[in-house]
């Protein structure tokens, strides 16, 4: 508790938004849950949460820019940016709105929309993108592992399309159609990130 109150870095507190008690004596679980909520609701730390998240993402773009078009975690507008939006906004608003806190990204995004930190349309778009990124990432891990080429081999390509189809607004019939929807989702995520956390253009990468 002392470490979280005084010394924890913002990235550690962002990671703590995902923490949950999964087992243990009820009294201990309540104490741990209360300690997590207190750490995440620190009003002094909240002041720098958004600026720190922006700085971390800028550094990641320099050092870990993503490894090909199917790296839906690290690529611009990918899963990392969805999670950064949810985590940074939770930390920023939790002191006055502890009800936003949730260890599940989708739930947190919905909570943030309820207090006006995101519009309903932004939250819905981010949730849809997060589902799509996790679906694609999961099936690629099972079928190929890291993949740097634009074209996916069979049977991975068919598997990706099957998984992605119900997660897209318009089910794609081929990989170019899926790539177009992925680009639209990435653009939406990047737009919300820059509107809520700050610009990620080259001029800020100093």
Predicted regions and their residues:
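A nucleotide- and high-energy phosphate-metabolite-utilizing enzyme signature
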Residues: 1-206
């Amino acid at each position: 508790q002392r470490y979280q109150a005084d010394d924890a870095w913002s990235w550690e507190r962002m990671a703590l938004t995902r923490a949950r008690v999964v087992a243990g004596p009820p009294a201990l679980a309540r104490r741990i849950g209360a300690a997590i909520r207190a750490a995440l609701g620190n009003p002094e730390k909240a002041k720098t949460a958004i600026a720190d998240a922006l700085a971390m993402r800028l550094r990641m773009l320099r050092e870990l820019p993503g490894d090909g078009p199917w790296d839906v975690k690290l690529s611009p507008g990918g899963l990392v940016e969805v999670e950064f939006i949810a985590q940074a906004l939770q930390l920023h608003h939790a002191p006055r709105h502890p009800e936003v806190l949730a260890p599940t990204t989708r739930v947190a995004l919905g909570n943030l929309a309820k207090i006006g930190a995101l519009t309903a349309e932004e939250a819905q778009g981010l949730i849809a993108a997060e589902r799509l990124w996790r679906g694609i990432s999961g099936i690629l891990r099972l079928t190929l592992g890291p993949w740097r080429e634009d074209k996916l081999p069979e049977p991975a390509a068919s598997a990706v399309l099957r998984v992605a189809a119900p997660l897209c607004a318009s089910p794609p019939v081929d990989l170019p159609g899926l790539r177009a929807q992925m680009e639209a989702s990435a653009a939406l995520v990047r737009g919300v990130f820059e509107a809520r956390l700050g610009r990620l253009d080259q001029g800020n990468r100093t």
